[in-house]
């Protein structure tokens, strides 16, 4: 995907046209992410006094900005004003979390109507008529809505919003720079907010008035303009950490001075009443009490979004350390926010072998450290959520989430103690157990109809998997010589695996599967692929006489290459069947893996009654590869999207297992018959 066009012609990643940027605010020196984004954008942070050709950088209208303005004026240096982008992080900057993008403005600052700005220039003069750009804008707007993403994201969509039908009045931080810029008269800001509240009541007789307090006011960091004195029978202060998207959905009207929530209200379909002069006022999408002069153009929501979110910001990809388009920032933020929402209460974990604990701590313990305990009472009383390794769960673990490896796991085997890139956490059951409904079952049902954006995303992901032969373990191997004819691939499995115990029928061993295939396809070329754990001598399932039933035993073979070389696949419950479906190879299931029973496979067993919809292969893939698993990038040490995980698997630039894990793995080969000790 190409990077979004920038309004700054000298902003480059390569640094071919660079500029010295003199700063007089310590934050430019201490905030590594800010420095890095500016560096990638072509700016060398410098100290001292500027010379000809140099520029001066200031942080918006911060308390230290006057220093830079004075130096710039004295030395005739251009000012570059820098701010956080409109999609920033989970927490505000005061928590130390780095931004995912910056607004680098060489003209003014977006919230000050007394100055021009690069954003206002875009809104005034850019054609904003490119069909591809508008399509990107609409897709990104939908993604932000679906994922409940905002500038700051320390809220949970499960927090219930108020009863709908209210008029939303947005409070802001007292003396906020955007308020000062919109109301430049000293002392007039409080009166403006009072006026806004009065208008909201007068223009909506009988309606409930909901004052949304600013998160930093709710947390006691900074005062707002409204407090308990403004509440009455009709007016309520609301400070619950609810999704802004849900809050706007229930509103019948929105009133704000200059809050970003006003911008989000426009994107949600509102025409908010504006009592300041923010960048989004004056373009025909708002009702302006004080219309900004010179804004005569009429824009659509998609045009405004394209300018403010795609063209104006400088976005950063923390996984690849590069500038990037908005879409990749949404990918990254969505993964980080999902981790915060699921992990913020902390986790107690049971039945986790020692070697798994460090990777799990990195995966799930970034917001609150995990605790590991085999005492169920301790786990229940911990005040944390509870997880158990799925195959080890018993009735004593009722109520715990079930944990398992995801479907794009690693370069190397789990049995060789290679840490996973992907894990699934299921509240109901687990994907390989067809005896009870799982979260994956629900997700597949929800994804029967994909939006065009979702379909494009998953199709692109699947095409990359196919092109680069990405599978669960990504083991290298050669393709053996295969006889001509109708080829049937039979993947072997670990015979004591939970998926066999729970998901197989009468055909529940590799030998029985081979015999069934030979009986059904007597003239076919039958290719048997042993499971890599079995090949490594780490798990049960070896067939001594496989050649009696198979024409080829493809040991150490590349599974993706095998799939591409056959006409069909027969399996009990192997994930290789799912990988074959992605490659449009027909699959016969004699068991009930998660992908059976939806009309995509030829099934020998009756499917569970809840598998009663007919998704397409892309719907199945979206649920299984995007919605269900979580991914973790060991290079950036951050939650990540499936696309980043695939990047890592393709490049192979993954940390190798530590020496202790390698030693344990070798020991396991000697103790394979005692696998319960280490699995």
Residue ranges and their predicted role:
Residues 1-69, 175-176, 326-384, 390-397, ...:
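N-terminal pre-catalytic "stem/leader" segment of glycosyltransferase-like enzymes
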Residues 2-8, 14-15, 93-163, 284-357, ...:
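Leloir-type glycosyltransferase catalytic cores
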Residues 35-38, 169, 182-203, 361, ...:
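Histidine-anchored nucleotide/phosphate-binding helix
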Residues 47-53, 57-70, 74-90, 147, ...:
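Segments forming glycine/polar-rich beta-alpha architectures that bind adenosine-containing cofactors
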Residues 49, 246-247, 379, 481, ...:
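Structural alpha-helical scaffold elements that stabilize or flank donor/cofactor-binding regions
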Residues 62-68, 241-286, 387-400, 404, ...:
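A donor-sugar binding/catalytic signature common to diverse glycosyltransferases
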Residues 83-85, 164-178, 213-214, 277, ...:
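Short loop/turn segments at strand-loop or loop-helix junctions that form parts
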Residues 197-240, 514-556:
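Catalytic donor nucleotide-activated moiety binding site of glycosyltransferases and closely related
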């Amino acid at each position: 995907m190409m990077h979004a066009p920038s309004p700054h012609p000298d902003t480059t990643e390569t640094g071919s046209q660079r500029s010295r940027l003199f700063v007089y605010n310590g934050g430019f020196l201490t905030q590594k992410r800010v420095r890095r984004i500016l560096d990638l954008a072509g700016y060398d942070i410098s100290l001292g006094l500027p010379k000809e050709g140099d520029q001066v950088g200031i942080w918006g209208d911060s308390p230290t900005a006057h220093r830079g303005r004075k130096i710039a004026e004295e030395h005739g240096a251009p000012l570059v004003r820098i701010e956080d982008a409109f999609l920033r992080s989970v927490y505000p900057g005061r928590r130390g979390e780095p931004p995912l993008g910056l607004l680098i403005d060489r003209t003014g600052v977006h919230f000050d109507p007394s100055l021009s700005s690069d954003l206002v220039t875009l809104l005034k003069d850019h054609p904003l008529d490119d069909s591809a750009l508008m399509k990107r804008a609409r897709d990104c707007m939908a993604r932000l809505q679906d994922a409940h993403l905002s500038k700051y994201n320390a809220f949970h969509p499960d927090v219930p919003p108020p009863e709908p039908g209210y008029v939303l009045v947005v409070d802001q931080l007292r003396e906020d720079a955007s308020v000062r810029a919109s109301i430049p008269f000293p002392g007039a800001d409080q009166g403006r907010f009072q006026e806004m509240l009065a208008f909201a009541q007068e223009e909506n007789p009988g309606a409930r008035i909901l004052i949304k307090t600013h998160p930093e006011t709710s947390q006691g960091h900074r005062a707002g303009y409204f407090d308990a004195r403004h509440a009455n029978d009709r007016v309520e202060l609301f400070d619950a950490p609810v999704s802004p998207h849900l809050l706007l959905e229930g509103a019948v009207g929105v009133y704000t001075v200059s809050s970003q929530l006003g911008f989000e209200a426009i994107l949600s379909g509102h025409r908010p009443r504006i009592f300041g002069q923010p960048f989004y006022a004056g373009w025909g999408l708002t009702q302006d009490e004080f219309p900004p002069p010179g804004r005569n153009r009429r824009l659509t929501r998609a045009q405004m979004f394209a300018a403010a979110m795609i063209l104006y910001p400088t976005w950063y990809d923390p996984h690849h350390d590069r500038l990037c388009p908005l879409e990749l920032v949404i990918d990254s933020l969505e993964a980080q926010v999902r981790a915060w929402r699921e992990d913020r209460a902390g986790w107690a974990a049971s039945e986790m072998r020692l070697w798994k604990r460090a990777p799990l701590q990195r995966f799930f313990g970034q917001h609150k450290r995990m605790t590991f305990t085999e005492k169920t009472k301790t786990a229940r009383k911990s005040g944390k959520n509870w997880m158990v390794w799925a195959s080890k769960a018993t009735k004593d673990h009722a109520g715990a989430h079930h944990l398992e490896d995801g479907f794009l796991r690693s370069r190397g085997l789990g049995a060789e103690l290679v840490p996973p890139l992907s894990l699934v956490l299921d509240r109901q059951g687990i994907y390989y157990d067809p005896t009870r409904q799982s979260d994956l079952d629900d997700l597949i049902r929800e994804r029967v109809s994909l939006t065009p954006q979702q379909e494009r995303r998953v199709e692109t992901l699947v095409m990359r998997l196919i092109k680069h032969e990405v599978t669960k373990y990504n083991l290298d191997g050669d393709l053996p010589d295969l006889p001509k004819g109708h080829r049937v691939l039979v993947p072997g499995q670990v015979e004591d695996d939970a998926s066999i115990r729970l998901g197989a029928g009468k055909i529940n061993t590799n030998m029985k599967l081979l015999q069934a295939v030979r009986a059904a396809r007597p003239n076919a070329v039958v290719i048997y692929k042993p499971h890599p754990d079995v090949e490594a001598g780490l798990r049960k399932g070896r067939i001594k006489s496989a050649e009696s039933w198979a024409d080829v035993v493809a040991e150490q073979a590349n599974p993706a290459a095998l799939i591409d070389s056959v006409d069909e696949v027969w399996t009990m419950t192997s994930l290789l069947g799912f990988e074959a479906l992605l490659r449009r190879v027909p699959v016969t299931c004699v068991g009930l893996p998660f992908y059976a029973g939806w009309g995509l496979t030829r099934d020998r067993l009756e499917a569970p009654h809840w598998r009663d919809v007919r998704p397409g292969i892309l719907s199945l893939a979206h649920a299984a590869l995007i919605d269900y698993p979580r991914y973790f990038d060991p290079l950036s040490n951050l939650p990540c999207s499936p696309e980043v995980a695939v990047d890592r698997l393709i490049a192979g630039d993954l940390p190798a297992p530590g020496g202790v894990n390698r030693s344990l793995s070798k020991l396991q080969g000697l103790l394979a018959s005692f696998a319960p000790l280490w699995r």
